[in-house]
Amino acid sequence: MQKHTKIYFDFFDVEYDPFTGQHNCKSELSGLPAQDIHHIEARGMGGGKTADRIENLMALTREEHEKYGDKKQYKAMLKRVHNRHIERIAKNKFK
């Protein structure tokens, strides 16, 4: 498992089976099963050392990743959706 995927799964308590690779992670955009953990600020495009922080990691389907990933016109929308997702989870996690 890649480092950024583990960071995301740990933060959001995603159930993961290391033997089968199965998980219950859902896309933050559609709620469909996620295949990719997307870097909102790409590692090679200014993300640098902060690229693998939870604020920069977002679960997406493969199709969503291809459509929205690494495209400047969608970055603000992805950040908005992701920040709302973090807030919702944090409220439930720390009640």
Language-model-detected regions and their locations in the chain:
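Cys/His-rich zinc-coordinating "finger/knuckle" motifs
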Residues: 33, 37, 68-71
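Histidine-centered divalent metal-coordination motifs
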Residues: 39, 64-65
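Short recognition patches in nucleic-acid-associated and regulatory proteins
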Residues: 34-47
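The −1 position to Zn-ligating cysteines in a subset of zinc-ribbon hairpins
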Residues: 26, 36, 60
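Short, charged surface segments at domain edges that flank catalytic/cofactor-binding sites
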Residues: 1-26, 47-51, 55, 77-80
